């Protein structure tokens, strides 16, 4: 899963890509091609 600042380009990669909001974060999911999954936001620091 990619972590991106903006999902604008991620949602246009494939016609089956959808934007879903879960737990206050935006996700792009693609059931036909799962390699296009993405989430908007920053990685958590350890």
Curated annotation (Swiss-Prot):
The cellular component terms of Gene Ontology attached to this UniProt record, alphabetical and capped at eight, are: ribonucleoprotein complex; ribosome
Q: Does the keyword Ribosomal protein apply?
A: yes
InterPro entries named among the record's database cross-references: Ribosomal_bL36 (IPR000473), Ribosomal_bL36_sp (IPR035977), Ribosomal_L36_bact (IPR047621)
Q: Which GO terms describe its molecular function?
A: structural constituent of ribosome
Per UniProt, which keywords does this protein have? Ribonucleoprotein, Ribosomal protein
GO BP terms = translation
Task: Show the SUPFAM superfamilies listed in the entry.
Answer: Ribosomal protein L36
Coiled coil ranges (UniProt) are: none
Under Pfam families, the record lists: Ribosomal_L36 (PF00444)
Q: Which family does it belong to?
A: Belongs to the bacterial ribosomal protein bL36 family.
Q: What is this protein called?
A: Large ribosomal subunit protein bL36
Q: Which source organism does the UniProt entry give?
A: Citrobacter koseri (strain ATCC BAA-895 / CDC 4225-83 / SGSC4696)
The record's gene field reads rpmJ
């Amino acid at each position: 899963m990619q972590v991106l600042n903006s999902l604008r380009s991620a949602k246009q990669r494939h016609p089956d890509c959808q934007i879903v909001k879960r737990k206050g974060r935006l996700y792009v999911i693609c059931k036909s091609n799962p390699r296009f999954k993405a989430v908007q936001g920053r990685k958590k620091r350890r």
